[in-house]
Amino acid sequence: MGLMNAFDSQTEDSSPAIGRNLRSRPLARKKLSEMVEEELEQMIRRREFGEGEQLPSERELMAFFNVGRPSVREALAALKRKGLVQINNGERARVSRPSADTIIGELSGMAKDFLSHPGGIAHFEQLRLFFESSLVRYAAEHATDEQIDLLAKALEINSQSLDNNAAFIRSDVDFHRVLAEIPGNPIFMAIHVALLDWLIAARPTVTDQALHEHNNVSYQQHIAIVDAIRRHDPDEADRALQSHLNSVSATWYAFGQTTNKKK
């Protein structure tokens, strides 16, 4: 029985009430694309199509499910958003494995919209503070000598980039990325990368001179963080990190206020 017929058979017998205490409550009719999506998702999860394997062509799926091309394309697009398939132009959809990046990517649009609301940036800055506070405490307690060496190298690149604002921003992001890599959890990495991307995109345009002064302060604060991690002092590492991120938040808030006054 095709999907369409199977669904239609479920709605043939509809009485105004079921039992003495229940009112009539018609079930919402699902779109054909949603039904195709659910069926394909179950087939993928049952390993009827293995990772890396191509799904049937759009025409074959249309015939199999007895639906039109728009329903098939909407279903495949929904599966792509879930990270279950990859779609390249001119090729059939290929089964893929969902990743942390897929999960975060789904949140990106909502996050950027939230950042544009009053107080949105402050909420995300607080989220970053809570998140990185845990990271530095973990680093101070568990970082290996090799991981501390990577932090020191990131700090050195930070130092070499002080006179180049674009380079310093990249080295700043890389420094915090090395911190996020220490636990070895890919979900932490995806969250960290997304948080910084969202926050940096929401920051105002600032003069080179103002940024240069900010760079020097951030670099000195990075030194304090690394020193505390090297001493395996989680409390001091946490204090240094919180001082750094609170300073960054206050500085960019001030930059934003200055920019708004000039408009």
UniProtKB/Swiss-Prot annotation:
Organism classification: Bacteria, Pseudomonadati, Pseudomonadota, Gammaproteobacteria, Enterobacterales
Keywords: DNA-binding, Repressor, Transcription, Transcription regulation
Domain of life, source organism: Bacteria
Gene3D superfamilies the record matches: GntR ligand-binding domain-like, Winged helix-like DNA-binding domain superfamily/Winged helix DNA-binding domain
Protein purpose: Transcriptional repressor that controls expression of the genes required for the catabolism of sialic acids.
GO terms (BP aspect): negative regulation of DNA-templated transcription
PROSITE patterns per the UniProt record, alphabetical: HTH_GNTR
Segments of this protein annotated with the region Disordered: 1-22
Name of the gene this protein is made from: nanR
Protein name stated in the entry: HTH-type transcriptional repressor NanR
InterPro entries linked to this entry: GntR_C, TF_FadR/GntR_C, Tscrpt_reg_HTH_GntR, Tscrpt_reg_NanR, WH-like_DNA-bd_sf, WH_DNA-bd_sf
UniProt DNA-binding region: 58-77
Pfam families, alphabetized: FCD, GntR
UniProt record similarity statement: Belongs to the NanR family.
Domain called HTH gntR-type: residue spans: 30-98
GO MF annotation list: DNA binding; DNA-binding transcription factor activity
HAMAP family (alphabetical): HTH_NanR
PANTHER family linked: HTH-TYPE TRANSCRIPTIONAL REPRESSOR NANR, TRANSCRIPTIONAL REGULATOR, GNTR FAMILY
UniProt keyword Iron, yes or no: no
